Swiss-Prot record:
It comes from Aspergillus oryzae (strain ATCC 42149 / RIB 40) (Yellow koji mold). Component of the ER-mitochondria encounter structure (ERMES) or MDM complex, composed of mmm1, mdm10, mdm12 and mdm34. Associates with the mitochondrial outer membrane sorting assembly machinery SAM(core) complex. Lacks alpha-helical transmembrane segments, suggesting that it resides in the membrane via beta-sheet conformations similar to those predicted for other outer membrane proteins and porin. Residues 358-377 are annotated as: Disordered. It is a multi-pass membrane protein. This is Mitochondrial distribution and morphology protein 10. GO terms for cellular component: ERMES complex; SAM complex. GO terms for biological process: establishment of mitochondrion localization; mitochondrial genome maintenance; mitochondrial outer membrane translocase complex assembly; mitochondrion-endoplasmic reticulum membrane tethering; phospholipid transport; protein insertion into mitochondrial outer membrane. Belongs to the MDM10 family. InterPro entries: Mdm10. The keyword Membrane applies.
Length: 431
């Protein structure tokens, strides 16, 4: 389950219209969410708050064996007025990553009109209207004290700058300066392709990541053009450190259906469409990826599909051409809808729906209703198993006003363990 600060950072990316899917680092995001989730190993309590539309705080306390905690603060020039901040109102799918529908590439917005994006024209400051900025700092206690700081800034409609600092205090009797490292990342996204340039002071590491989308350029597409049904992307990454002579590289492909592929054509709203026209291009969304690391000889393929709005499956097969070792992992997630309050009028609604003509429903209304139905979930169950019969089970859901995560890991050589992880968000009480 995502921390509250990570949730706010995702809201910042969505509010500033930054496409997280158009990046090589997100090539296998869906498979990683379904197969590489971790089960909690200790009791941890989070108390977070969005005290103002621009300022958020978070406190963490961990127990069982070792008591530790952290204090986090976040400030954004973009207000989060319309972002749900109470644990009872936040959609669970925002906090528990699962199958993620890849968004179609879009052209960058040349005129940043954040007033219309966030529907909050009163609180947007003109000095930051063109360059949204986010500041985040976390102090981990007890000693050794670690400070993590993050700086995000949209330099231009196509440029995104990220600065991350990590500093760890040395032993109490040591007179040496605290160890610190800086990671700088500059992202450039045009919709058709994206590039990321990285530099880390740790071993003077330089890096590059790039992604190319096949098909028409969204910058030259018109509003009357037919929506794309699928997306094929190719990308690569490379790293080099002159200090440690470290070299790394990988390449990958991704094919994914887009939302338009599973939608019923608009011509069916009139009721005169043929049988072929009323059938969607794909019965369910799916994503396929292929990644290759030439230096280590590792090859990995993933296949993820969303069989229904509340059920998703994923599998991964990895093979090493040098050692002949292989890996097979399979997993799924099952969402549970929240029970609707029965007002005794469901019989009347069914009768009204049966008597309505076929021309009344429209595609936007169906899409909105489907989205609201998907967000009306209060728990999710994730299961994964590998070729060695190591099983992980994770449950995340709501208990009263708390968001709770509990998991168990079972294996032939490991003792079973089960810990509970509690994540509580109590915010917006003063607004």
């Amino acid at each position: 389950m995502l921390d509250f600060m990570d949730y706010i950072q995702l809201a910042f990316a969505e509010g500033t219209n930054w496409n997280r899917d158009n990046s090589y680092s997100s090539l296998t995001a869906t498979a990683q969410s379904l197969l590489d989730f971790s089960t909690p190993e200790r009791l941890r309590v989070h108390l977070s708050s969005l005290s103002t539309p621009n300022f958020a705080t978070s406190y963490t306390l961990g127990t069982v064996g070792l008591i530790d905690g952290s204090v986090s603060y976040l400030y954004s020039t973009v207000p989060f007025t319309n972002t749900p901040s109470r644990s009872a109102l936040i959609p669970l799918r925002k906090l528990s990553p699962g199958y993620r529908q890849v968004a179609p590439p879009s052209a960058p917005i040349e005129d940043w009109n954040l007033d219309s994006i966030l529907d909050n024209p009163q609180n947007v400051q003109p000095s930051f209207a063109s360059k949204p900025t986010l500041l985040h700092a976390t102090l981990h206690l007890p000693p050794p004290t670690t400070l993590n700081a993050l700086f995000l800034r949209r330099i231009s409609p196509t440029m995104h700058l990220t600065l991350a600092v990590c500093s760890t205090r040395g032993p109490p009797l040591s007179k040496s300066a605290p160890q610190a490292s800086l990671l700088m990342q500059l992202s450039h996204d045009t919709g058709k392709y994206s590039n990321e340039y990285l530099f880390s002071t740790d071993n003077a590491l330089f890096g590059w990541r790039g992604l190319w989308n096949f098909g028409p350029d969204p910058r030259s597409s018109t509003d009357t053009a037919a929506p794309r049904l699928s997306l094929l992307s190719a990308g690569a990454e490379a790293y080099y450190s002159p200090v440690s002579s470290l070299i790394g590289m990988s390449t990958g492909l991704r094919f994914s259906t887009l939302p338009a592929a599973t939608d019923v054509p608009a011509s069916t709203a009139t009721g005169f469409a043929t049988a072929n026209q009323s059938t969607p291009i794909s019965t369910f969304p799916y994503t396929l990826t292929l990644t290759l690391t030439p230096l280590t000889g590792s090859l990995s393929t993933t296949y993820s599909l969303r069989a229904s709005p509340n059920l998703a499956f994923s599998s991964r097969f990895g093979f090493n051409v040098y050692s002949w070792e292989s890996e097979m992992v399979a997993g799924c997630e099952l969402w549970r809808k929240s029970r609707k309050q029965d007002d005794g009028l469901e019989w009347a609604r069914r009768k009204m729906r049966a008597s309505e003509p076929l021309s009344l429903p429209s595609l936007p209304a169906e899409s909105k209703e489907r989205q609201e139905e998907e967000e009306a979930t209060d728990s999710v169950l994730k299961i994964r198993v590998d070729q060695s019969w190591n099983v992980r089970v994770l449950w995340e859901g709501r208990v009263k006003e708390l968001l709770v995560s509990a998991g168990v890991g079972l294996g032939p050589s490991d003792t079973a363990f089960a810990w509970m992880y509690i994540f509580s968000v109590r915010a917006g009480l003063n607004r």
